[in-house]
C-alpha cells in the first residue's frame, strides 16, 4: 500500500548538497514546525526541484515521512523571493532571519505564526519601506513574544513615547500589519535598546550572518 504524502506549507531555511545530485533541506512549516527533508536528484540539470529547494522559497511541499526525515515528492512555490538577492544589505538580514527562525524552530510543534512572521519580514526587506535594521528589531521582538520569551512591561518608563508605542504595536498587532511604521532617529534608538536588551537576556547563540552584517557597518 502506497504511503500518503504529507502536505506542508513553509519556508526553506537551509539547503545543502548531499552526495552527487541530492539536497538536504531544513524547512520551517506551519503544520509541523522545523523539519529535515531530502530532495532526491534536486541538483540534476532538469530536476523539477532545482528552483524550489533554495533558501527563502515559500512553498507547499508534498513529503513522505520517514523515521528521522522526510523525502520531497512535489513542491509548488508561492514565492521564490528572487528580488531579495539584489537587496544589499537586505539579503544578509534575510539570512539572519532564516538563522533565527531555525534557532527558535522545534520539530513537531505547529509554527503557523512563526512562518507567517518570517514571510512578512522577508517581504518587508524586499519592499524597502522600513530600514533593514528596523525590520530586524521588529522580527526579533515578535519572535521572542511568539516563543514566550518576552512579556510587555507594565509601562514604558525610561523609553521614548513613540518607541513605547512601537513596542506595543510589535507585540499586539496582526503579523500583516507589523512592518508598517517608521520612527525618528531618537525613537528608533530607544526601541532598539529595548529589543536588544530583551534579546540578549534570552538568546545566547552567535549568528554567522549577523556577524557579517556587523562587519559591514
Task: Describe each region flagged by the PLM.
Residues 1-23, 28-217:
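Non-catalytic alpha-helical scaffolds and adjoining flexible linkers that form interface surfaces
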Amino acid at each position: 500500500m502506497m504511503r500518503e504524502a504529507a502536505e506542508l506549507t513553509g519556508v526553506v531555511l537551509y539547503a545543502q548538497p548531499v552526495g552527487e545530485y541530492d539536497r538536504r533541506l531544513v524547512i520551517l512549516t506551519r503544520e509541523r514546525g522545523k523539519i529535515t527533508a531530502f530532495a532526491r536528484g534536486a541538483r540534476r540539470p532538469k530536476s523539477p526541484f532545482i528552483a524550489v529547494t533554495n533558501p527563502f522559497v515559500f512553498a507547499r511541499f508534498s513529503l513522505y515521512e520517514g523515521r528521522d526525515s522526510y523525502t520531497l515528492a512535489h513542491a509548488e512555490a508561492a514565492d521564490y523571493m528572487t528580488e531579495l538577492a539584489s537587496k544589499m544589505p537586505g539579503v544578509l538580514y534575510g539570512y539572519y532571519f532564516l538563522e533565527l527562525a531555525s534557532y527558535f524552530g522545534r520539530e513537531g510543534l505547529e509554527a503557523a505564526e512563526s512562518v507567517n512572521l518570517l514571510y512578512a519580514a522577508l517581504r518587508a526587506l524586499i519592499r524597502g519601506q522600513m530600514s533593514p535594521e528596523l525590520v530586524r528589531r521588529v522580527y526579533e521582538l515578535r519572535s521572542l513574544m511568539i516563543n514566550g520569551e518576552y512579556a510587555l512591561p507594565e509601562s514604558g518608563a525610561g523609553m521614548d513615547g513613540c518607541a513605547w508605542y512601537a513596542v506595543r504595536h510589535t507585540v499586539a498587532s496582526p503579523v500583516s500589519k507589523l512592518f508598517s511604521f517608521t520612527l525618528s532617529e531618537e525613537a528608533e534608538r530607544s526601541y532598539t535598546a529595548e529589543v536588544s536588551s530583551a534579546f540578549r537576556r534570552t538568546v545566547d547563540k552567535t549568528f554567522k550572518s549577523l556577524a557579517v552584517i556587523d562587519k559591514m557597518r
